[in-house]
Swiss-Prot record:
This is Imidazolonepropionase. Keywords: Cytoplasm, Histidine metabolism, Hydrolase, Iron, Metal-binding, Zinc. Pfam families: Amidohydro_1. The keyword Zinc applies. Belongs to the metallo-dependent hydrolases superfamily. HutI family. Binds 1 zinc or iron ion per subunit. Zn(2+) binds at H72, H74, H242, D317.
Amino acid sequence: MTEATSELVIWRNGRLATLNPDHAQPYGLLERHALLVRDGRIAAIVAEDDVPSGRSIDLEGRLVTPGLIDCHTHLVFGGSRAQEWEQRLNGVSYQTISASGGGINSTVRATRDSSEAELLALAQPRLERLLREGVTTLEIKSGYGLDLPNERKMLRVARQLADHNGVELSATLLSAHATPPEYQGDADGYITLVCETILPTLWQEGLFESVDVFCENVGFSPQQTERVFQAAQALGIPVKGHVEQLSSLGGAQLVSRYHGLSADHIEYLTEEGVAAMRESGTVAALLPGAFYFLNETRKPPVELLRKYQVPMAVATDFNPGTSPFASLHLAMNMACVKFGLTPEEAWAGVTRHAARALGRQASHGQLAPGFVANFAIWDAEHPVEMVYEPGRSPLWHRVVQGELQ
């Protein structure tokens, strides 16, 4: 990204969907308003009649929203799982596929066998699909390397992707994603490697800003998850968790006990878990793509989340095994159709609540004075259009840190 200019730039004659909950109108809509941007941040929002003199860009009545935030992705990986999906449709069990070398282990193998340049080339078109939908910030997880050099490689590629494409990155260490082949039968030993070697080394190298764990019967136990959280906490690193996707293990309560940023998936979330998340300020990250692709039937408890006023983020969970959808608009649509969110809730889920899921709620996810000038400009009349019709992105331009992309 180019360096933000200190000159005041006036983005005038826009229809602003601020997503600011303090504004009375749905979506925080402000008709005929202008954004005043300086040093990569929003200096002020003023009515069109009050625009000062200075360098201006005429939006010609276009819709402006906060830049979209995809707060949960596995964008960097090698290989493909398309044939495995076809096998599953033909009745072959995941256990059979895994025993023959498929499943997550096939992605681990392909990722380990790929160079940084190869992983970058594979991830680039995936990222471009998200950028075409107005994404200005995204999270990318490791988790297909499962050893020090390959986890490092994945995180380095994530950083290069962001640097080359005008997008802000939140990198997450997900080394506790699965037990690698060389540690089969010794998950505790692998967690020791994560806690004592991978996590502190890559943290010292500045390659990530949060730590995630897959806490499930087919992943890691709550006890193993807590070991990773303790190692992260000792270094002052925020945590989050893949929890309650396939069963109820108390993962949401565990994430909440460590004041985690988000609890993700949460189809089997209990009321006790929801209450714990409310108390800790943990965001509920809904991932409808995985729910759809796995043909699940148990839905996240959206009504309970509303009752307890737990913020709901929405993300793609883009990954090769369970959610091969690089479309945040589609995730928003699925969240409405499958989980019962309103379009306005879905928009909050990819803006201000997604920002909170990344610990950036004070600077991202709204059009508001003092916030980073990340926004999307649309040839659209209303924000609902992007939720209603996924696959047709009316994006005009993205603006990242005040710079037109």
